Amino acid sequence: MKKMRAARAIKLKTIICEEVEVPELTDNMVLVKTKLASICGSDLHVVNMGYTAYASDFPLPYGAPGHEGVGEVIESRSPDFSIGETVLTDPNIYSSKTFADYQAIDPKYLVKLPKNSNENKLMMAQQLATVEYSSKSIGDIEGKTIAVIGQGSAG
């Protein structure tokens, strides 16, 4: 079986890089070759403080908690994605594994990117999902005074 590189958090504040097998696909899954991966604040919280359900699961799965990335479809068992397409892995900390060369992922966590697009710029679309989620949860703010705090890595 083919091998790949993958980061792996083996305990709090400890990440190693190791060779593991490229994941095999099951029905309706997509194999994505990671081209770009960003480090989200959530990743730091998981690794440095044990934040989220992952804390009790050390060592973490290969490639986790990386969940923000751009990649290329290498193999697909989904009718919605074809080999060669460039995709954005939708932020899902429990499904994505962008800190590995390859990840087998449910297509519901993938977004097709336009051909010949600037992948570095589109990587920032990950941030947009957080803004969209927050906007939907705060309700109507028309006529109210609000503060936006924490620009994060996009700031």
Q: Which role fits each region the language model picked out?
A:
Residues 155:
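N-terminal Rossmann-fold NAD(P) dinucleotide-binding loop
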Residues 5, 29-31, 145:
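Residues that mark the start of a beta-strand
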Residues 13-18, 41-42, 82:
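Short N-terminal binding/cap micro-motifs at the start of the first secondary-structure element
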Residues 23-38, 52-93, 116:
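Glycine-rich beta-strand-centered segment in the early N-terminal region that forms part
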Residues 67, 90-149:
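NAD(P)H dinucleotide-binding glycine-rich loop of Rossmann-like/cofactor-binding domains
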Residues 18, 85, 100-101:
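Extracytoplasmic/periplasmic beta-strand context in beta-sandwich domains
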Residues 45-52:
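Short Gly/aromatic-enriched secondary-structure transition segments
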